[in-house]
Amino acid sequence: KFPLIISWSCNSRQDSYQISIEKDSDIVYKGEKVVSSDSIIFIENLNLEAETNYILKIEITSNSKVFYGDKKFRTGIFGEFLGKWISDDRKLEKEEDYYKERRNTILRKDFELKETPKEAFIYIVGLGYYNLYVNGKKVGNAELNTDWTNYSKGIFYDTYNLQEYLVQGENIVFVELGNGWYNP
């Protein structure tokens, strides 16, 4: 069980809110109506499944009017991440070599799909900055992804839905690695 942090903004004074979460049209969480102007909340001890799509629904009351909103979200990988690090295994011979200019590294994977998938997610992380492309289109709107963390304590990964980028037949995924703090 994990906490969920939810935030929203309201263009007028908020009097109350009510949150619900659905999976496949089934309600998996329904909170009580809360009289509050809070717009950042923590929901503790949710029993959500890993790598699963949900819809968060919110009902906001403001000046006796009711507003509705919803947002899709996907839970991440729970527990130990079993991915494999990709590296060129170059070792630094001298520390000053770390600061030399280098071209960005490109990682490429070609594969074929017999049909376009209904869902396709990628979980990706870089120890430094990266951009992700599928079939020549940049995935997401962020530039130079990856949040900095103390890598000995934890590493954040990003999740992208690739369904709209993939095609039946030949596909190409490539990642451009930035010349950053994990240069070698």
Q: Positions of the model-derived regions?
A:
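Structural beta-strand segments of beta-rich domains
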Residues: 2-6, 118-120
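Aromatic/hydrophobic beta-strand junction motif of beta-rich domains
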Residues: 6-10, 124
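Recognizes extended acidic, P/S/T-rich segments that occur
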Residues: 14-53, 63, 67
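Beta-strand-rich interaction surfaces with strong enrichment in secreted/lumenal proteins
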Residues: 30-33, 44-46, 96-99, 109, ...
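Surface-exposed coil/turn segments at beta-strand junctions on protein surfaces, enriched
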Residues: 34-38, 47-51, 100-102, 115, ...
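Accessory beta-strand-rich segments of carbohydrate-active enzymes
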Residues: 53-55, 62, 76-79, 107-184
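Extracellular fibronectin type III
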Residues: 65-75
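Low-complexity, Pro/Ser/Thr- and charge-rich linker/hinge segments at domain boundaries
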Residues: 73-96
